[in-house]
Amino acid sequence: MFELCLRIKNWHREAGEDLHIGVLALQGDYAEHINMLQSNNADVSEIRLPSQLDDVDGLIIPGGESTTIVQLIDIYDFRTKLVEKASEGFPIWGTCAGMIVMARELTDHRPEPLNLMNIKVSRNAFGRQIDSFEEDLTIKGIDGKFPAVFIRAPIVVENDSSVDILCSIDKPSGPVAVQQGKLLATSFHPELTNDSRMHEYFLSIVKM
């Protein structure tokens, strides 16, 4: 696992060159991810049909309303395709609700996640929208502190040895950034900051 956790150095606007990244555009804050990727010179497509996944090098599942996103994934027949792509080593990054979607299991057993990563997740672990906050985090693979925005965020409550913990916090206690091969999940919203280093980190995974 450690070989995938690269130190991101000298990655700026060139990070996304020669890469075509998809952002699942069924619901949620996909536009903010698109803007961040484009600032790193990546070619970006809004993904609305499963067949489009074959045309991109990696996928971001954005934050939003997890139940709605899963319902739309099933309505548009994404589930089987996403599971197949993940098993083939296709890079996927889920942020906030995207982490919930990628989980093996949820503490409240709804909605039914895709079981892409060996993690059990608690939804809304940090409270309601009014309890949103920002915290500077130390994240494995990222130089310096990262300003993480938490909005009704989930947290990982169980994981197996195949999952690399990139960052944990104390209250509530648990991982908020995890990686399993080329699958990445974060509880927080990097796309809502002016800091592109988490996106650069994902682009480095895609380039592996």
Model-derived features with residue positions:
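Amide-donor transfer/coupling interface in amidating biosynthetic enzymes
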Residues: 2-15, 123-208
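Short coil/turn connectors at secondary-structure junctions
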Residues: 18, 56, 88-90, 111-112, ...
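Flexible, glycine-rich phosphate/dinucleotide-binding loops
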Residues: 30, 53, 101, 108, ...
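Cysteine-nucleophile active-site neighborhood
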Residues: 66-138
